[in-house]
């Protein structure tokens, strides 16, 4: 993110955010207003993470005939309104979780109808969860069993005496991407564990940024990790694939630059890269979509060159992007001469 101070210095801070629901992703529904950040904003009559239930239908006490789990809320007397992290009739199933068996861990993922991406263990895209018969209406189910003794690249991480003496914990990081063979800012990572106790429990939680398959950084001519620069100064955005051994190249397929007015909540955005081709914007900022070889990792990393610019005074520039993964250096698309883009989109 580029921050502009009153001294015309642009400060840079880059981060990734993971969430299990984003109404902008294919398959997810929103019966309210889908916010740019991915949350579904309900009107005064609706509730739920996707605004799918009338508040007037919520049931309490003797009016409710079922026991909802995992903080689910009863409605219509016999149904459960789940959070985005759970599904099933009683909210008893995690959208990304595990069943702990005597000889292995069965990873499970429930995705909405319309999901056309991939769900796989972080070790390799070849460790995909495979589609199976779903036991939740309206959801696609993916699963994969990994045996405790598996020594392949899909093998589990094993921890002895964790969290308590005598316990054994197996874990894996599950990547979920909504576009095949790519990674974007609206995709997410879950850390899934099986803790072997007298009763076996599967746990899932958001993974830290260090586990994401992309590391984003910025540099200028003088620094490889630039923290501040002036308006119109040249900036290079670097996108390095990490944690995926069978990926040796990455290139930006789509990148959008946007900013939000913290007072009015208005946002404006411009598309800088589309289908791998740099776009011309009304801010007269030139973008170049390239790649370069990292001599340390022998990996081709995505590289977007641009100039620092302002959308809203004293507000940061933010980035929404999607990268294409390749087993070697990515081929470059054939791009036509860029045309002047339309006025930036706005929303309140």
UniProtKB/Swiss-Prot annotation:
Cellular component GO terms held in the UniProt record: extracellular region
Signal sequence, renumbered to the chain: 1-19
Gene3D superfamilies linked to this entry: Laminin
Classification via InterPro entries: EGF-like_dom, ZP_dom
Lineage summary: Eukaryota, Metazoa, Spiralia, Lophotrochozoa, Mollusca
Keyword field: Disulfide bond, EGF-like domain, Secreted, Signal
Annotated ranges, domain EGF-like: 60-92
Subcellular localization(s) per the UniProt record: Secreted
Full protein name: EGF-like domain containing protein 1
Disulfide bonds: 64-74, 68-80, 82-91
Tissues with expression: Prismatic layer of shell (at protein level). Expressed primarily in the mantle with highest level in the mantle edge and lower level in the mantle pallium.
Residues covered by the ZP domain: 99-342
């Amino acid at each position: 993110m580029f921050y502009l101070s009153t001294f015309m210095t642009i400060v840079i801070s880059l981060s990734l955010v993971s969430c299990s629901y984003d109404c902008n992703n294919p398959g997810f529904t929103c019966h309210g207003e889908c916010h740019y950040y991915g949350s579904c904003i309900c009107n005064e009559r609706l509730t739920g993470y996707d605004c799918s239930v009338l508040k007037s239908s919520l049931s309490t006490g003797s009016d409710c005939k079922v026991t909802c789990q995992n903080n689910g809320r009863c409605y219509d007397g016999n149904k459960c309104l789940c959070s985005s992290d759970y599904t099933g009739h009683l909210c008893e199933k995690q959208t990304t979780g595990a069943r702990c068996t005597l000889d292995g861990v069965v990873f499970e993922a429930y995705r909405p109808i319309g999901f056309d991406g991939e769900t796989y263990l972080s070790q390799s895209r070849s460790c995909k969860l495979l589609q199976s018969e779903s036991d939740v209406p309206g959801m696609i189910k993916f699963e994969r069993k990994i045996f405790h003794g598996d020594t392949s690249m899909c093998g589990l991480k094993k921890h002895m005496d964790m969290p308590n003496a005598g316990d054994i914990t197996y874990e894996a990081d599950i990547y979920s991407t909504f576009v095949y063979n790519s990674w974007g800012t609206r995709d997410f990572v879950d850390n899934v564990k099986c803790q072997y106790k007298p009763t076996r429990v599967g746990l899932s939680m958001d993974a830290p940024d260090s586990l994401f398959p992309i590391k984003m950084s910025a540099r200028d001519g003088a620094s490889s990790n630039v923290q501040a620069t002036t308006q119109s100064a040249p900036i290079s955005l670097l996108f390095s694939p990490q944690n995926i051994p069978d990926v040796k190249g990455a290139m930006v397929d789509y990148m959008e630059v946007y900013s939000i007015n913290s007072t009015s909540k208005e946002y404006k955005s411009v598309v800088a890269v589309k289908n791998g081709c740099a776009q011309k914007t009304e801010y007269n900022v030139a973008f170049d979509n390239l790649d370069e070889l990292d001599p340390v990792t022998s990996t081709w990393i995505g590289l977007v060159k641009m100039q620092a610019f302002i959308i809203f005074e004293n507000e940061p520039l933010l980035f929404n992007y999607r990268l294409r993964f390749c087993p070697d250096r990515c081929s470059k698309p054939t791009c036509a001469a860029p045309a002047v883009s339309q006025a930036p989109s706005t929303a309140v």
